[in-house]
UniProtKB/Swiss-Prot annotation:
Protein name in UniProt: Gamma-glutamyl phosphate reductase
Reactions mediated catalytically: L-glutamate 5-semialdehyde + phosphate + NADP(+) = L-glutamyl 5-phosphate + NADPH + H(+)
One annotated GO molecular function: glutamate-5-semialdehyde dehydrogenase activity
The keyword Iron is annotated on this UniProt entry: no
Taxonomic lineage of the native organism: Bacteria, Pseudomonadati, Spirochaetota, Spirochaetia, Brachyspirales
Record bears the keyword Amino-acid biosynthesis: yes
EC numbers on record: 1.2.1.41
Species of provenance: Brachyspira hyodysenteriae (strain ATCC 49526 / WA1)
Length: 432
C-alpha cells in the first residue's frame, strides 16, 4: 500500500473511532496487554536482534550509548509496558466530557465537549516501548495513529505492532488502520508534508530529530528538543538526603530525558557539600565537569571542564556549578535549561516558593528527584512524551493531552438578528 493511501485510510478511521464506547476501547486494551504478555519471548528475541545490530552501529559511532541503552527491552521494562496499558484502562474516558455548559438564553444551550485530535503521527528513535504506550493512549482517546520508529529497533517495533494490529483486527467494531506502522526514512519526509490529513506530530528522540521535524513541517508539533534538567542544592538542604536525590536523578537511568545534567550548589555549603558529592559520584562512576569556582574546592585532576552549560550528556556525566542564591539558580536554569524538569532541594519555604514560581519549566519540584517527570509516575497510565510547549499540552502528555474540544449549541430556531436588534437578550447563565 502506498503511504498516501495508508494515511487517507487512517484519516477515515478517525471519524469511526469517535463512535466507539468506553467498554469496546477498554476491552481492546486488556486484550493487547494479555497478548503482549503471552508473546514476550518473541518480543525479547526480536529485541536481541536489534541490540546485535545496534552494537555494530555503536562500535562505528553511528549511534550514542544512550540511544543503545534506550533500545533495550528487558523483563522489567515489559512489565512496565503491560502495567501502563492496564492503567490506561482504569482511567476515565476523556472523550465526550462536558467541559463547560452555559445557558445563553431560554432553549439556547452552549456546551464545550472534549473530542479526539484526529490523526497523530509519532516519529521516534530507539524506544520500542513507545509503540504500546502511544497506541494504548490513542485507542483510549479515540485517535488514529501512524508510528515511525528508527531502523535500529525495527524488529522489536514489528513484533509489538503485529500483536496490536492482530488484536484490533479481531475486534469488529475497530476500523482498519486505527494503528499503523511505517518503516522507511523516506516515509518521514512524506509524512511531514501531509498537513491535509495529519493533525499532530509527536517526535520522540534526540535534538536533531526534533529540530528537523519542527523545521520541515506545517503540522503542529508536540514535544521537547532537549532534556537539560537541573538540581539546585540550597544552603538549607538536608545534605544526606540531597545526595540521595542527586544520585537518583543522574544514575537511576542516565540516558533518560529527565535525568539531571547540571547540579547547582549554594556557595554557603559548597566547601562542605561538594566533596561529599564528589565521593558519591566517583564511587558510582559518574564523570564530573565543573567551573573554576568548583575546581577551587574539588582539586582532583579527573574533574573536567564545562564546555557548554546548555548541554545534555545523556550518560553518566554531569556539570557542577556554584551559585550565590536561589535567584542566581533560577536565572541560570531559565537561561541554559530546556524548560523540562528542574528541582530545588531545600528546607527554606521562601526559597522553595521563589524557585517553583520563577523557574520556567514544565515540571518544577522541591525535594524530589527529576526522574519523577513521567506519565506513568504521574498516574497518567502512560505518556506520549514530555512537552515543553506553552500551548495545548505541557509536561508529561497523557490522555488529556490527546484531546481537544468543540463547542456545541443546542437551540430552538433562534437567529442572531433578534439579539442584535434587542428583540431578545442573552442570559449567559453558567451551568458548569
Amino acid at each position: 500500500m502506498q503511504l498516501i493511501d495508508l494515511v487517507k485510510n487512517a484519516k477515515e478511521a478517525t471519524y469511526k473511532l469517535q463512535s466507539l464506547n468506553t467498554d469496546i476501547k477498554n476491552n481492546a486494551l486488556l486484550e493487547i496487554a494479555k497478548k503482549i504478555e503471552e508473546n514476550k519471548d518473541k518480543i525479547f528475541e526480536a529485541n536481541k536482534k536489534d541490540l546485535e545490530y545496534a552494537q555494530k552501529l555503536l562500535d562505528e559511532n553511528k549511534i550514542s550509548k544512550s540511544m543503545f541503552n534506550r533500545l533495550k527491552l528487558d523483563e522489567n521494562k515489559l512489565i512496565d509496558v503491560v502495567s501502563g496499558i492496564r492503567d490506561v484502562v482504569k482511567l476515565e474516558d476523556p472523550i465526550n466530557k462536558v467541559l463547560l455548559e452555559t445557558e445563553l438564553d431560554d432553549n439556547l444551550l452552549l456546551k464545550k465537549i472534549s473530542c479526539p485530535i484526529g490523526l497523530i503521527a509519532v516519529i521516534f528513535e530507539a524506544r520500542p516501548d513507545v509503540i504500546s504506550q502511544i497506541s494504548s493512549l490513542c485507542i483510549k482517546s479515540s485517535n488514529a495513529v501512524i508510528l515511525k520508529g528508527g531502523s535500529e529497533g525495527e524488529n522489536t517495533n514489528k513484533a509489538i505492532y503485529n500483536i496490536i494490529e492482530e488484536t484490533l483486527n479481531n475486534i469488529k467494531e475497530f476500523p482498519k488502520n486505527s494503528v499503523n506502522l511505517v518503516f522507511t526514512r523516506e516515509d518521514i519526509k512524506e509524512l511531514l508534508s501531509m498537513d491535509k490529513y495529519i493533525d499532530l506530530i509527536i517526535p520522540r528522540g534526540g535534538n536533531s530529530l526534533v529540530q528537523y521535524i519542527k523545521s520541515n513541517t506545517n503540522i503542529p508539533v508536540l514535544g521537547h528538543a532537549d532534556g537539560i534538567c537541573h538540581l539546585y542544592i540550597d544552603e538549607s538542604a538536608d545534605q544526606e538526603k540531597a545526595l540521595k536525590i542527586c544520585l537518583d536523578s543522574k544514575a537511576q537511568y542516565p540516558s533518560a530525558c529527565n535525568a539531571v545534567e547540571t547540579i547547582l550548589v549554594n556557595k554557603n555549603i559548597a566547601s562542605e557539600y561538594l566533596p561529599k558529592l564528589y565521593n558519591l559520584f566517583k564511587e558510582n562512576e559518574i564523570k564530573m565537569n565543573a567551573d573554576a569556582e568548583v575546581k577551587k574546592i574539588l582539586t582532583s585532576s579527573d574533574i573536567g571542564e564545562v564546555k557548554e552549560w546548555h548541554f545534555e550528556y545523556g550518560d553518566k556525566e554531569v556539570s557542577l556549578k556554584i551559585v550565590s542564591d536561589t535567584e542566581e539558580a533560577y536565572n541560570h536554569i531559565n537561561k541554559y535549561g530546556s524548560h523540562h524538569t528542574d528541582s530545588i532541594i531545600s528546607e527554606n519555604k521562601d526559597n522553595i516558593e521563589k524557585f517553583m514560581t520563577f523557574v520556567d519549566s514544565a515540571n518544577v519540584y522541591c525535594n524530589a528527584s527529576t526522574r519523577f517527570s513521567d506519565g506513568f509516575r504521574y498516574g497518567f497510565g502512560a505518556e506520549v512524551g514530555i512537552s515543553t510547549n506553552k500551548t495545548h499540552a505541557r509536561g508529561p502528555v497523557g490522555l488529556e493531552g490527546l484531546t481537544i474540544y468543540k463547542y456545541k449549541i443546542f437551540g430552538n430556531y433562534q437567529i442572531v438578528d433578534d439579539y442584535v436588534n434587542h428583540r431578545a437578550s442573552f442570559k449567559h447563565k453558567r451551568i458548569k
